[in-house]
From Swiss-Prot:
The keyword Membrane applies. The gene is NRXN3. Glycans are attached at N58, N105, N757, N1189, N1257, N1301, S1317. It comes from Homo sapiens. The chain crosses the membrane at residues 1569-1589. This is Neurexin-3. The lineage of its organism: Eukaryota, Metazoa, Chordata, Craniata, Vertebrata. One of its GO terms (cellular component) is presynaptic membrane. It is a single-pass type I membrane protein. Expressed in the blood vessel walls (at protein level). Highly expressed in brain, lung, and pancreas; a lower level of expression is detectable in heart, placenta, liver, and kidney, whereas no expression can be observed in skeletal muscle. Isoform 4a is heart-specific. Residues 198-235, 643-680, 1049-1086 form the EGF-like domain. Belongs to the neurexin family. Pfam families: Laminin_G_2. Residues 1590-1643 are cytoplasmic.
Amino acid sequence: MSSTLHSVFFTLKVSILLGSLLGLCLGLEFMGLPNQWARYLRWDASTRSDLSFQFKTNVSTGLLLYLDDGGVCDFLCLSLVDGRVQLRFSMDCAETAVLSNKQVNDSSWHFLMVSRDRLRTVLMLDGEGQSGELQPQRPYMDVVSDLFLGGVPTDIRPSALTLDGVQAMPGFKGLILDLKYGNSEPRLLGSRGVQMDAEGPCGERPCENGGICFLLDGHPTCDCSTTGYGGKLCSEDVSQDPGLSHLMMSEQAREENVATFRGSEYLCYDLSQNPIQSSSDEITLSFKTWQRNGLILHTGKSADYVNLALKDGAVSLVINLGSGAFEAIVEPVNGKFNDNAWHDVKVTRNLRQVTISVDGILTTTGYTQEDYTMLGSDDFFYVGGSPSTADLPGSPVSNNFMGCLKEVVYKNNDIRLELSRLARIADTKMKIYGEVVFKCENVATLDPINFETPEAYISLPKWNTKRMGSISFDFRTTEPNGLILFTHGKPQERKDARSQKNTKVDFFAVELLDGNLYLLLDMGSGTIKVKATQKKANDGEWYHVDIQRDGRSGTISVNSRRTPFTASGESEILDLEGDMYLGGLPENRAGLILPTELWTAMLNYGYVGCIRDLFIDGRSKNIRQLAEMQNAAGVKSSCSRMSAKQCDSYPCKNNAVCKDGWNRFICDCTGTGYWGRTCEREASILSYDGSMYMKIIMPMVMHTEAEDVSFRFMSQRAYGLLVATTSRDSADTLRLELDGGRVKLMVNLDCIRINCNSSKGPETLYAGQKLNDNEWHTVRVVRRGKSLKLTVDDDVAEGTMVGDHTRLEFHNIETGIMTEKRYISVVPSSFIGHLQSLMFNGLLYIDLCKNGDIDYCELKARFGLRNIIADPVTFKTKSSYLSLATLQAYTSMHLFFQFKTTSPDGFILFNSGDGNDFIAVELVKGYIHYVFDLGNGPNVIKGNSDRPLNDNQWHNVVITRDNSNTHSLKVDTKVVTQVINGAKNLDLKGDLYMAGLAQGMYSNLPKLVASRDGFQGCLASVDLNGRLPDLINDALHRSGQIERGCEGPSTTCQEDSCANQGVCMQQWEGFTCDCSMTSYSGNQCNDPGATYIFGKSGGLILYTWPANDRPSTRSDRLAVGFSTTVKDGILVRIDSAPGLGDFLQLHIEQGKIGVVFNIGTVDISIKEERTPVNDGKYHVVRFTRNGGNATLQVDNWPVNEHYPTGRQLTIFNTQAQIAIGGKDKGRLFQGQLSGLYYDGLKVLNMAAENNPNIKINGSVRLVGEVPSILGTTQTTSMPPEMSTTVMETTTTMATTTTRKNRSTASIQPTSDDLVSSAECSSDDEDFVECEPSTTGGELVIPLLVEDPLATPPIATRAPSITLPPTFRPLLTIIETTKDSLSMTSEAGLPCLSDQGSDGCDDDGLVISGYGSGETFDSNLPPTDDEDFYTTFSLVTDKSLSTSIFEGGYKAHAPKWESKDFRPNKVSETSRTTTTSLSPELIRFTASSSSGMVPKLPAGKMNNRDLKPQPDIVLLPLPTAYELDSTKLKSPLITSPMFRNVPTANPTEPGIRRVPGASEVIRESSSTTGMVVGIVAAAALCILILLYAMYKYRNRDEGSYQVDETRNYISNSAQSNGTLMKEKQQSSKSGHKKQKNKDREYYV
């Protein structure tokens, strides 16, 4: 079949082979034998491709070539018919044939090419073409088979061949050479009856002087480029060739007509006055460049043009005379023409014959189409580029030339245009655009850039394209996915099918997905997605991409393979705004609207690989320079491929899978429980108890068509929600849940709601078996449009969604519990278990939430691998039970519960049924029995635990029955399985009884059921075949004592009574746990403390003490839990009042935790040097200070101790504020802080309760709910808030001596000392004169204050607390004056007592001298390393009351009675109140075993027969009870079984003591009641004061003055209910005058 060729695109490629093989031109010789064949690798002729070879024969029939689709419809066959070549082919069962006009059986060489272009196939024979065209349903040919030359093997089944009789066709006889697919040589797979060493025309070696022979149009041609000779056989000297005379021109003349182009410049000669009309033309020029692609010369338009360009380093010529394009490409033997060396090009045309030669040697000759011979052009002659190169007709490239051009000359029969010279002399018809330099300068190469990480990207300026535009670039990578280019336009509100506003934008993008290149375009009417490659392009080779658009239509070319596209709608304008992103997207995408169809963006796939030669609208972009200017992270200005595989060094840790990427290794951490570049960082774990969840609230509604989801989970339940996406506006969801021990994936795209035509409801997949085994399991979900893949461990399930709708909408990602339930008919069961490494589309959400990297995380689950006890219920007696609705377990069953008991026997679960069916679970002699009857008689399965389970520990029980009637009982880790034959269904009726039965039911139980009593103990986490009942609220009937929670029967301190190093403290009828230094809270210190997450932008929590209530301390305790990944940051800092400079700071430096503090001398620091703590794990740090001594401990690591040398001050003066987060100091902390405790203040709890003294700013977010501060009764373990603290208030004496001369041998107390600083602007330890606002004596009162909300100190076992020997007869010595006794009346303070204002006259100040267990020796000198101060232990059974009565004090003298010294009794305490500002002081009587009181050093007790214990403190009565005035009780002091909390010793040079545990917290509370005998007490008080005045009136050691504005204790109410006591203000007056009224007071 012969037809006229219109617009046939013929490409003739000259490829020079290397070495001796080329010189010999070896080929295949076919003998024409039966069953002869040569088999080559499949030729992809599906859409666009070329195949060529040369042959010689003398026969008229024979099969040349054959391929097909495996016996269906499509085939292509070349054969000889009557001496001519016939092309016969079929597509989609539509067949045609083409027959050449030329005879070929003439024993001459012939060149044959088959060119495929979708519906058209062209047969080219010796430059003449015949085409055949089909109009099938599909525009491509399906090729399955390999390619056969010379014949088809007879062993192939005829049914597998599409063309009937092809095997019977006679074989080809002759020679075939140089078979190529495009430019590449295919691989020979095998042959039969073929001689492989046939010589071609080059076998005679016709080329002289080392020239290389190759075939051109069937004739041998010589390549003389490397010989220095010319001519047809390389036999002529080049200097004698007149055709090359221009090479002999002087260098000066050559340089005169040369110009440099840099990509934006070009020359334009106007032909409108003198149009070209010629039948023969000649173009000559020389070029020099580093550039691979660029326009050299162009003239003409429409279908009449000449285009000369550099394409991928080869010279390309395209000529169209009106009947179709002729293209010739000339390539060098070695390398490319873009080698920055001069190359000469000569193009000649004579009528239809076209010849192009490069460097006078490489020559290609061809013919234009049809009979058109005239070239006409009245347009422009472009040199070096054009305004829009991509839009020029026939242009194979889209960018301008970069390099040097010289002596560009066009001539025909009529004119000669020396274009370079005309530009140089500025001819009027020649326009010069850009800065063209008329000499050859070096043009900087467009260096490639390498994106080394997926996060790397650079920003390009806005692409100003409206109706047309072009982009070209080269890329190279080995990774399959990555976003290469993206830009979009202005958001526009449009209504979608849901009749809702939807933000749409015009956008343009190029992405690499699964190794294929895609173009995405939306011009306002919908997105098109064009696949531009037929094979994967991530093989590490360079690929050239050229995109050209004109209105709605355009093409994308990859390595010259073009794919056309047409945008949707009618608009021809692409409206873009903002930057264009190359290589990826920025981390902050707030201003970006990402299209749903752009999967790489939604999946967070950044491009990793190289990009070079980026041209936009023909103009180059120096992307290397842009990357340097933007300081782009992860972008390198070079491109080289590492030869060694990166995974050979096994870089991935923790059994992660290593994959080789582009010059990097990729560690797949899925399933390892770790994350990071090498999977070195442990991923955070969330624990769920059925009431907990984590909800990620997306900042905006998300729409995706592709998702990657992975996580690990561990659970003992067979049911429960794992992860789900939910929408507020639709039923769209991607949900993963446990369903009967399997993972169920359900995807619902709500197709019905948006009026889709085809929908079958949610798509469901299942994978995995028996996953409720309390082991880690890994889940992965991959969705790409309609394709679904679910993988659980190694079990894979795949599916395809039905319908055209692929978009998933969601507002939230939820775990544990589904809170968005509006569009859900059946709510999934809550999850009980652990979740880790949740990654959704590249984001690790659990760790992002924990570290504060995201602000839209709602967290109720708890971090850490915790022992989960969900919704526990206590059955306090064996007669207690409850009933629930019938257990639904007809075909299968999954039961789970936890129990804890000390009883060996008891009913746990029972449900009777129809007939004999029943199920029972019981505890028999400490072992679980599972008893059941399905109708075949009762069976029992007994648990095989290693020991009885009534050990007061929690145990897990799982009972399952599957469809095959296999029953299994798992107790903790032990499993027993039994297969039951016969009936398979369990038909239950009536109530399900839990923990027991009604009394009358025990006598009617089936046999094999042993229990005759109920269960006494705790049940938790009860799961009844997927249903999580609330045992209390869902009960149909309850009987006996059933309580929520599980306190357990233990009322004494055990080793495990308090978790997380909490301190167990024995109480009267129970125990409490001191959680102060643990960062935890709750009854047993196993609940998280108040937790705040500090974001990356920094935050600050600032607590400020009231101005009149600023403490000063000699010792401090600080504890906090944290997790972070920062290397530097301040966690907590406490500062003194302005001007003092004292501070204490907890910080992380170089990843290690440390504390630095200054209390008046130099900075003292202590640091944990061994291990960094910025590993993202949860750590608890504990710090104690006693004077200059300090301890620091992290978790259970060894304690760091620091004892500074030399003289050290000890008091931390006038503490003013606590700053948490480091933002105020510029050292930001990012991460989680939990349970902060400092000297009695739980600052984070106070912040969560909106304490008015706390301010919060910056990125700070509270996690979950604030732990309850309400206590329980004393008979059970109590929370740490219901505790008592000991406060000892001392003031320092000002003396006339200097500090250097003072003695350092003073006695130090071991308790924390809170020192009233009286707001002095100087250090309390520096004897600088400080004048208070008033004068007078100052009281020094050791106080024991009952604090209802502070944490108790440690209780220890010790002998009786003894009294100081010097104060047995009468312990109270008070000196005062009449003036000082009138303080109360002068203050005029209001009354806020419990009784109201009427009871104020009878309120009093209750004073107790019972301190922290220290003794006082009167023989010791009254000296201290800073001040003279004394503390006395004093117990009174009367109270010293002060009230407004006749302008003075009423005082009750204390007295001692022998009944006060009884063991296990507490002395009577009277409660009175002076005003609302008075503290309640409760004193206790120490028990004594002897009447003698030995002398003991301060802070020590006589414990010779005891093991070392922490410091002795006294436990007060709880404030929740009224004191019985008729009974005397002594404090209970026990020895708890716990690890000591490290505590710094007092500052004492040269002595190191075992750290104790003590704290000082100052609180106040109101007192009630009236003191009897006011008058007698006042009289006694006056006598004592007079005696004291007489004895001490002549002392010259300085005096204390009473500041009447501050000597009352204020009750400043706090938001959390505690009362803060105002400090007493002191004055240091080392040089003050002595006045007679100055007195000293010791109480």
